[in-house]
Amino acid sequence: MPIATESVSFYLQLTGRLPSLDSEAAPSQVPPTLFDVEFMTKPDLIHAAFRLTPEDDGALAAHLSGEFSNGPISAPPEAGFPFGGLLAALCAGAMRQGLGIEAPLRSLTVQYLAAARYGQSLHFRPRMLRGGRNVAYAVVEGGQGSKLTHHASATYGADGPTPVPLTPLQAPPPSLDCLKDAPGISGPMAPRFSQHVDYRFENGPNILGGNEGKPVVERVWMRVKDGAPLDELRMCYLLDALYPPAWTAFKATPMMTTVDLRCDFLADPTPDAAPDGWVFFEYRLLDHGLGWSVDEAIAWGADGSPLALARQRRKLL
């Protein structure tokens, strides 16, 4: 894979997604970001990162800021690639905005086909497969020029009454206030995208072997730092806003790249369930072998109600 040698150690430490196997350029060859971050606050950066601008040909354009690189903050943004949680959010946003869908998002699957480059617009072209009063199906393709970088599909649908509802995932999280002094993610090897998230770990972080010989689980309260209420875009961002759980099982972290991410949205968050945007997450390794690593994330509201879950497949390199 044509990736700069000096960048490999960064990925091995704290970043969660490598460029695709057919990436054409090393990170050092990627043009600089178009964002003028010097004069933007963190909320401004986050809002700009989620922004999709309609273009004359019907596409929606996003500009990728190096502030959302998965490379470490101690290196230039070009040492990493655009954060996959943000790209998932952009795919979801492009379908809703471009197709005028009003029903709640209930599932999203994103395939990461190739690495998008900084300094170029990323264009999304959504398409409705089938609309309906109760359920609607949509897809979107994202790319730069003739290069396809992402493909996503989504299911939207209205909620309805259920005679006997069951919530087996109900699990009250630890008190947010009790973890107000808990550690977060910081230091020179922290990925740039993590600067836009508040973290409060329960018995963590355990990266670089902290879970060796134990269940491979990380539990953490998280919120996006823009002060906005939690919505589907921010949930997409947070469901991927941690290092691979497998990296807590090994002192020497294995190289891997995400190939797809599926998110299921079980309930729309309310201010009571996500106070000030905070949600409790559990990231868990499900399988690691045969050249693959599969993990999941579950998001709970403050009352223990399950809000969303995600499953991610990564190719070991």
Model-based region annotation:
Residues 2, 19, 82:
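Short, surface-exposed alpha-helical recognition segments that flank or form part
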Residues 10-11, 19:
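N-terminal, intrinsically disordered, basic low-complexity segments enriched in Arg/Pro/Ser/Thr
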Residues 11-14, 34-317:
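Terminal targeting signals and extreme-terminal segments of soluble enzymes
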Residues 19-20, 54:
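Sequence-pattern detector for short linear motifs
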Residues 20-22, 29, 33-36:
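Short, positively charged and aromatic/hydrophobic N-terminal segments
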